[in-house]
């Protein structure tokens, strides 16, 4: 199970939001490249980057910061936030992004996910952000009637690399991940699931590892994203990575 540090970009800075509220943000750094380098040096094998301005604008906004992160690290980078078209995907891949996350558009226009997977095989993940089990879109500002698990199952034959599942009620709260909901997602669909939201300490990583599978359907929880906990010093990234590696072995 990969331990993936998160860099959320707002106005070119690294921030963390509380429950996805753009007005409740803490600025941690004005140097995204240096922040990415720091996490990579602690052993991260992948970087999770979100363009928060992009999520609301409907197109990526923080291109300079994304380029700075790419220049600073050699590990793969996955990026989400405001990706709505195949043209935008191509631009991001040209910038050096390795994997792209389709969020709101996956709920609004599922067919685009299939086309994207066909055009960029192995490089497309779907971000499913849920509030009480229902999919939220447009930077979490709107909750739909779509069931999160049903949306994941819709893409089983698309060639989606991973589902990034976020429980909005936990995000940025340090109250622990929603292990049960993440496990349900992985047990119900056949696409590997990355857990996101609420991680606060090593015990949370342990709980996810203990529930990571593989399940009878062959699927598993393949990773966990951590943000606020590593920025606040509550979780030692290197220790979390070491724990995961010991578990895998």
Curated annotation (Swiss-Prot):
The active site is at residues 8, 129. Keywords: Amino-acid biosynthesis, Cytoplasm, Histidine biosynthesis, Isomerase. The keyword Transmembrane helix does not apply. Its EC number is 5.3.1.16. GO terms for molecular function: 1-(5-phosphoribosyl)-5-[(5-phosphoribosylamino)methylideneamino]imidazole-4-carboxamide isomerase activity. It comes from the Bacteria. Disulfide bonds: none annotated. Pathway: Amino-acid biosynthesis; L-histidine biosynthesis; L-histidine from 5-phospho-alpha-D-ribose 1-diphosphate: step 4/9. It holds the Pfam family His_biosynth. Its main location: cytoplasm. The keyword rRNA processing does not apply. Transmembrane segments: none annotated. GO terms for cellular component: cytoplasm. InterPro entries: Aldolase_TIM (IPR013785), His_biosynth (IPR006062), HisA_bact_arch (IPR006063), Isoase_HisA-like (IPR044524), Isoase_HisA-like_bact (IPR023016), RibuloseP-bd_barrel (IPR011060). It is found in: Cytoplasm. Gene3D superfamilies: Aldolase class I. One of its GO terms (biological process) is L-tryptophan biosynthetic process. It catalyses: 1-(5-phospho-beta-D-ribosyl)-5-[(5-phospho-beta-D-ribosylamino)methylideneamino]imidazole-4-carboxamide = 5-[(5-phospho-1-deoxy-D-ribulos-1-ylimino)methylamino]-1-(5-phospho-beta-D-ribosyl)imidazole-4-carboxamide. Belongs to the HisA/HisF family. This is 1-(5-phosphoribosyl)-5-[(5-phosphoribosylamino)methylideneamino] imidazole-4-carboxamide isomerase. The lineage of its organism: Bacteria, Pseudomonadati, Pseudomonadota, Alphaproteobacteria, Magnetococcales.
């Amino acid at each position: 199970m990969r331990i993936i540090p998160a860099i959320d970009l707002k106005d070119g800075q690294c921030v963390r939001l509380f429950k996805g509220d753009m007005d409740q943000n803490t600025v941690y750094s004005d140097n995204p490249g240096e922040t990415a380098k720091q996490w990579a040096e602690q052993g991260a094998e992948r970087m999770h980057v979100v363009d928060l301005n992009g999520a609301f604008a409907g197109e990526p906004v923080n291109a300079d910061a994304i380029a700075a992160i790419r220049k600073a690290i050699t590990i793969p980078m996955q990026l989400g936030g405001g990706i709505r078209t195949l043209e935008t995907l191509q631009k991001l891949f040209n910038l050096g992004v390795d994997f792209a996350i389709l969020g709101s558009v996956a709920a609004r226009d599922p067919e685009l996910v299939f086309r994207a997977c066909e055009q960029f095989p192995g490089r497309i993940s779907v971000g499913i952000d849920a509030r009480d089990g229902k999919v939220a879109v447009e930077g979490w500002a709107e909750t739909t009637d779509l069931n999160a698990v049903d949306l994941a199952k819709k893409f089983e034959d698309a060639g989606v690399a991973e589902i990034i599942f976020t429980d909005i009620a936990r995000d940025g709260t340090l109250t622990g991940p929603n292990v049960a909901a993440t496990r349900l997602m992985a047990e119900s669909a056949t696409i590997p699931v990355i857990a996101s939201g609420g991680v606060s300490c090593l015990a949370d990583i342990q709980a996810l590892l203990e529930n990571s599978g593989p399940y009878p359907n062959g699927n598993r929880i393949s990773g966990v994203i951590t943000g606020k906990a590593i920025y606040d010093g509550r979780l030692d990234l290197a220790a979390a990575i070491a724990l995961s590696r010991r578990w895998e072995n």
